[in-house]
Structure formats: C-alpha cells, structure tokens
C-alpha cells in the first residue's frame, strides 16, 4: 500500500483532515431501501456490505445508485449522527452529490488511482483538504 496522497476531485471538501477506517465495496449502493438511516447499517440483502455499519467510516465504492430520495436518506443520516465520515467514489452522480451537500458529508470523486481496488475494508485513510486521500 502506498503512503503518498491520492488526488481526487472534491465535491464536498473537508476543512480539517478526517481520519477513519475504510469500508470498501465493488458494488454501487442505493441509500433508499439499502441503508437504515436510524442505525447507519446496510440492509439491502443483495449488497455485499449487508450488515455493515457506515457510521464514522469512509465509504469507498464505484458510486451511488437508485432513487432521488436517497439524497434525503443521507441528509437524515447526517442529522442522526449515523452518516459515513466521508465517501470516495469513482464517479459521483447527482443523488450522492445532493445528499452529501445537504448532510455536509465529505465527498471526493475521480481518484487518480482506483481506490476500490487498492484499499481493503479495515484500512485507515485520511481525507485531506483539496481532495487528497492519504492511504
């Protein structure tokens, strides 16, 4: 694993570094029906992260999917304190962008290296201002 920062494009940037454990998935995730906003747990039985809690972790995956209501699920998670510490995706789509903006959840996309392939669940990363991920 590299120790050099990976450059991404910040969609919702961090003001201060955020250090947290990573939760990695090779699948896109729908927040509506796929995540319980009360607990922060992935509840979609067809998703490889089913049973995992997103709370306080940096979620690394290809992107989001699903209903526009997913934006409000992310906002509710932020309000309840069950949101991820940050999200890093290959490509951010509008549902994810709106949810992260509303919930003030750090969102980085278009990493210069494929972090879905490079990182493993349990690794610790640091999100740095300007869209850098220290791995």
UniProtKB/Swiss-Prot annotation:
UniProtKB keywords: Isoprene biosynthesis, Lyase
InterPro entries registered for this protein in UniProt: PMDh-S-like (IPR012016), PMDh-S-like_dom (IPR002840), PMDh_S (IPR020794)
Catalytic activity: (R)-5-phosphomevalonate = (2E)-3-methyl-5-phosphooxypent-2-enoate + H2O
Superkingdom of the source species: Archaea
Biological processes, Gene Ontology terms: isopentenyl diphosphate biosynthetic process, mevalonate pathway
EC number: 4.2.1.182
Residues annotated as the enzyme's active site: 67
GO molecular function: hydro-lyase activity
Metabolic or biological pathway: Isoprenoid biosynthesis; isopentenyl diphosphate biosynthesis via mevalonate pathway
Gene3D superfamilies listed in its UniProt record: Phosphohistidine domain (3.50.30.10)
Record family assignment: Belongs to the AcnX type II small subunit family.
Subunit structure: Heterodimer composed of a large subunit (PMDh-L) and a small subunit (PMDh-S).
Summary of the function given for this chain in its UniProt record: Component of a hydro-lyase that catalyzes the dehydration of mevalonate 5-phosphate (MVA5P) to form trans-anhydromevalonate 5-phosphate (tAHMP). Involved in the archaeal mevalonate (MVA) pathway, which provides fundamental precursors for isoprenoid biosynthesis, such as isopentenyl diphosphate (IPP) and dimethylallyl diphosphate (DMAPP).
Protein name according to UniProt: Phosphomevalonate dehydratase small subunit
Organismal lineage: Archaea, Methanobacteriati, Methanobacteriota, Methanomada group, Methanopyri
């Amino acid at each position: 694993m590299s120790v050099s920062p990976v450059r991404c494009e910040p969609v919702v940037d961090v003001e201060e570094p955020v250090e947290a454990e990573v939760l990695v998935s090779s699948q896109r995730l729908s927040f509506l029906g796929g995540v319980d906003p009360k607990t922060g747990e992935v509840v979609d039985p067809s998703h490889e992260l089913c049973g995992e809690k997103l709370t306080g972790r940096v979620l690394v995956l290809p992107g989001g999917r699903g209903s526009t209501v997913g934006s409000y699920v992310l906002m509710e998670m932020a309000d309840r304190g069950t949101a991820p510490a940050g999200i890093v995706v290959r490509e951010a789509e509008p549902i994810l962008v709106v949810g992260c903006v509303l919930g003030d959840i750090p969102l980085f996309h278009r990493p210069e290296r494929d972090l879905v392939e490079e990182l493993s669940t349990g690794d610790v990363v640091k999100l740095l201002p300007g869209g850098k991920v220290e791995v």
